């Protein structure tokens, strides 16, 4: 839904929500909410994406947060983490100050993830834990935002069972947070503002970045792939690319501010530029432009194999600041399962892509995502995933048990793989993941690698930690002054998922800002 199409800015759910009786809440979503529905969601609007470069917070809202504090709890992916940075930026522009003490915060926001059932259960548990705070301090505001807010079943559950929540808003209208807050302060009922699947591209939103070493940079929003297990196309909307000049300007500003690494974000970054109607411009072109900017390291995530072009491979192969690490989710190694998943590629085409990548980028580190126990997955089909892992030799993988999500096509399939079978398969897969990770790590012993030092180790404050360009965790002892810098470290010991080493020296990146 574009800004001018919005017919209602919010919905107040009246005091009747306190009643325990069952009730039809669908009427509250008219005009501002469209529940996840594959048939409807695939009917992507033909309207051109509207770009708002003139975003400003109305002066009447400035000062709203004076002498008030906020706390944001974030679940989920990097996109959610970046959304939290934007939400924090808006709140600070309103006068609020961040706090880490949930017991004293005046505004508590839970930025949610809808990708797996376990994540949703954690959120509901979190909301429930806040009920006592609302009783003790009725003037605080509690809000739920993020992907779960885009699901009608979730919002219904909050309306019926969690009266301690004051506001619910979605992924498309974060820039309306000042108005939502004002409404929540004035209203005696819950404020719900959840927009449709369309969405605009809003530039110049304030941000409070987490740290000054690494930064997220959105290059696009939404996804049009509609993998049958995934709720994201419903919660994040259609694919919308930012203009390349806006992205490049943001990266240049980050370079001037001294950031050492950026990650280009999108639900499917390989689709970048397909919706730009006035120019032919893709991720390869964007990477080429950013490679000329003085950011020592540039990453991108997440990739879909279907859209990975030879042009992108060629640009990455040129080296420079584009790191030789590609995360390429495969999900399954069996063609029948891939077809049911709606992945749009085959085992053979995936392996062909891997071959082309390795031929052009011999030093590449490939990692992946895999789902175990998809509906109807047989033992033989699962074993094809294991053999594909052997053929590729991934250096790491994020592995998951299949989690049924309401509103997706897969939710209509019978989840007929027993839980004990899923867990046994996951255990076998993870054993293989650990085996290949150990092989990859062992190759570093005795080598000197460049590490971006990010801070102290989680296990020992006297030890520093950082990552190589291939995203390998390295622990080493060095002066605290090295935090935020690129350093050389000699690897003394290779563990299964991390490396231990000795500090050698600081590295000065030889790049010129353009």
Swiss-Prot record:
One of its GO terms (cellular component) is cytosol. Binds 2 [4Fe-4S] clusters. One cluster is coordinated with 3 cysteines and an exchangeable S-adenosyl-L-methionine. One of its GO terms (molecular function) is metal ion binding. Residues 209-440 form the Radical SAM core domain. It is found in: Cytoplasm. CDD domains: Radical_SAM. [4Fe-4S] cluster 1 binds at residues 77, 113, 147. SUPFAM superfamilies: Radical SAM enzymes. Residues 442-505 form the TRAM domain. Keywords: 4Fe-4S, Cytoplasm, Iron, Iron-sulfur, Metal-binding, S-adenosyl-L-methionine, Transferase, tRNA processing. Residues 68-186 form the MTTase N-terminal domain. Its cofactor is [4Fe-4S] cluster. [4Fe-4S] cluster 2 binds at residues 223, 227, 230. It catalyses: N(6)-dimethylallyladenosine(37) in tRNA + (sulfur carrier)-SH + AH2 + 2 S-adenosyl-L-methionine = 2-methylsulfanyl-N(6)-dimethylallyladenosine(37) in tRNA + (sulfur carrier)-H + 5'-deoxyadenosine + L-methionine + A + S-adenosyl-L-homocysteine + 2 H(+). Its EC number is 2.8.4.3. Residues 1-21 are annotated as: Disordered. Disulfide bonds: none annotated. PANTHER family: CDK5 REGULATORY SUBUNIT-ASSOCIATED PROTEIN 1, MITOCHONDRIAL TRNA METHYLTHIOTRANSFERASE CDK5RAP1. Belongs to the methylthiotransferase family. MiaB subfamily. Catalyzes the methylthiolation of N6-(dimethylallyl)adenosine (i(6)A), leading to the formation of 2-methylthio-N6-(dimethylallyl)adenosine (ms(2)i(6)A) at position 37 in tRNAs that read codons beginning with uridine. Monomer. This is tRNA-2-methylthio-N(6)-dimethylallyladenosine synthase.
